[in-house]
Every structure is written in structure tokens, then in C-alpha cells.
A protein has these predicted regions:
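Active-site-adjacent beta-strand/loop module that shapes the phosphate/pyrophosphate-binding cleft
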Residues: 75-101, 113, 136
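A short coil-to-beta-strand element that immediately follows conserved catalytic motifs
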Residues: 63-72
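Short Gly/Pro-enriched turn/cap motifs at secondary-structure boundaries
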Residues: 2-6, 82, 104
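Short, charged/polar surface micro-motifs in flexible loops or helix N-caps
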Residues: 17-22, 30-31, 43-44, 72-77, ...
């Protein structure tokens, strides 16, 4: 192992499926936008499940309950803030309360959209989410 320091960003996302579609976010990033699943970074001192619940409410207005783990990163993905490496986990969640904020959260989320799991807009996703999106239909059968 080399002496270089390693910095990781632990990220956790929820997959909410209703009426055969999954909920996605469109978020602002450096003057552009991208699509991913509701969720985000685990903060220092916070556990992954707490982060998932917090991020879901912040981004969508919905309270959710984790149902089961779906996937975790298989490959190394560099953050846009290299040399940070992203480690992502994806959980199936179910809605338990709240009200969907269809127009975003007036912060980083511009919009919420529902998509067929087999036809996700992967061309608008970052590589880590694109990796997971390819497996998603198999996890929901």
C-alpha cells in the first residue's frame, strides 16, 4: 500500500418504487443538471440509515423506511472533487409519510420525476449511479 492518503465520500441513496416507477431527482451542479436517486453524503458522526432518512426528506419532502439493501459500489468512482473516491449504497425504501415536493427543494434539487426502472435517463447520471441503474430492473423483480 502506498503512503498516499485516501479520502472517501460515503453516499447512500433510496429507491422508492410506486406504480411501477422509481423516484429520481434532477439536481443543479456547476451550471448544469444531473439525475440521480434521492440521497447523498453521510456526514461526520452520522450513520448511513440516518443519512438516508435525512437526505430523502430534504430532497423530496417524504419520510421513508428502509426495506432492504439493493447494491453497493463495485468499482472505484472518483468524485468531481478528485482525488475523493465515492462509495455508494442503494436501498429500497417505502413511503411512510410526508408530502412530495414536486418542484424540488429550493436548494440543490430542481425537480422530481418518476421513471420506468428499465428506461432510466442514464445519459444524465454520474458514473456511480449509471453503474447501479444497469442492475436496478433485476433487483426489483
Amino acid at each position: 500500500m502506498s503512503g498516499a492518503s485516501r479520502v472517501f465520500s460515503c453516499r447512500i441513496y433510496g429507491v422508492l418504487r410506486e406504480d411501477g416507477k422509481v423516484l429520481l431527482t434532477r439536481s443543479a451542479f456547476r451550471g448544469s443538471s444531473f439525475i440521480n436517486f434521492p440521497g447523498g453524503g453521510v456526514e461526520i458522526g452520522e450513520g448511513p440509515m440516518s443519512a438516508l432518512l435525512r437526505e430523502f426528506v430534504e430532497e423530496t419532502g417524504l419520510a421513508v423506511r428502509p426495506v432492504r439493501a439493493l447494491y453497493s459500489s463495485e468499482r472505484a468512482h472518483l468524485s468531481t472533487q478528485a482525488p475523493i473516491q465515492i462509495v455508494s449504497a442503494y436501498w429500497l425504501v417505502e413511503r411512510v409519510g410526508g408530502k412530495l415536493r414536486a418542484g424540488g427543494n429550493d436548494d440543490d434539487v430542481l425537480d422530481l420525476l418518476w421513471a420506468d426502472p428499465a428506461r432510466l435517463p442514464v445519459e444524465e447520471m454520474f458514473p456511480a449511479d449509471r453503474e447501479f441503474a444497469g442492475y436496478l430492473p433485476n433487483f426489483l423483480d
